[in-house]
């Protein structure tokens, strides 16, 4: 083991940049966090300022070391985990972005996606990239930038512009432009990457007219990519040695490294991943086949279902509807009523993700009667998170043939005991909440630490997977199915709301 005592995980999320310091026993020593601006130029469009992402992330790194009172030469390695799919294009020479980052939630490329469907690309994309055609993924976002920023496609062909997901952007900045890389997990979310040959897909690049010259080199999730002296006194060079997209990092942090193990992360959106080992399972039920990390950071595969609005729907109750003052209040108000009084909230504010994939669905509240009050709507909004999770799990079990015995959970909303109990009730499955909640950062730290020998193998980490609380189903099957049938009816009516007549 190295004499250096700590690993730093950088967790670049959708609404904030965070830095977490961990010791050899995977204890969290200190955390620093900075929020940044969400930019909404038009309805359904979402952007970030890449320079603000960099500024907030780099300052959290400086802050977290100061908070922990440790110097940079005590850091063995840095791991990075990031919001996936969010797309940045910048000038190689100056490091200046040519456009704002187009965020994963942004729906502006729905028309490009319609063209791909009309051109019969669905089967090819599913078979080779593991994905469905949706504005969510990076490929159509890159095309949009190249289509709309004058002269950019020609500049990209000349090697003057670079593309990256957020991990790539951060490493480029941290290494002063010396290293242009991504890892397999992030590459697998671009719709430009062949998950079987593990290389950029020439046909997808041709179809979307994206020059190969602008793409990063793709590497394993656990190896040394480069070094940085950011935040360090006296210029100590710290290896950057772990990268994984946030959901794959959480899967690894939960130590779901064996076939059939699954986790659900309750953040801005909800993301369920099931490790399928060395086998890429093709989904017949609207799920994604994606790349995950095996026990040493090598390529494994996973099935993934994405729910776009989870914590974001609670923020909507707080910020737009003013029904609660704080996200934590939602549990208190939800438990003031016995049920939702027949109300279902479908939070399809930006369309629906897995297994529906309908960018034209919109949010709706069904079952309103005169007796419905704010508490019923708050409760129904919380319940919608659990219903959407069941939608995904049903699809996952059908594709994999694996019946899940326990679901590991993480993310901000898992502190809500009402939601976790309802989740167990509506799934009819055990829900396991870990003691260490920072599993996304843990995953990045584990990947970075394994690469530099800070930890020798995962066996050293197994005892860290302590379950703080287990939730068990508390309702009958008939009641479960009755409630779920109501949800399915509500979803059906929220779909295709925005679709334009041909």
UniProtKB/Swiss-Prot annotation:
Keyword flag Iron-sulfur: no
Sites where the protein binds glycerol: 84-85, 136, 246-247
Source species: Escherichia coli O6:H1 (strain CFT073 / ATCC 700928 / UPEC)
Stated family: Belongs to the FGGY kinase family.
Stated regulation of activity: Activity of this regulatory enzyme is affected by several metabolites. Allosterically and non-competitively inhibited by fructose 1,6-bisphosphate (FBP) and unphosphorylated phosphocarrier protein EIIA-Glc (III-Glc), an integral component of the bacterial phosphotransferase (PTS) system.
PANTHER family xrefs: GLYCEROL KINASE, SUGAR KINASE
Positions that bind sn-glycerol 3-phosphate: 14, 84-85, 136, 246
Catalysed reaction equations from the record: glycerol + ATP = sn-glycerol 3-phosphate + ADP + H(+)
Designated name of the protein: Glycerol kinase
Biological role stated in the UniProt entry: Key enzyme in the regulation of glycerol uptake and metabolism. Catalyzes the phosphorylation of glycerol to yield sn-glycerol 3-phosphate.
Residues engaged in binding ADP: 14, 18, 268, 311, 412, 416
Enzyme class label: transferase
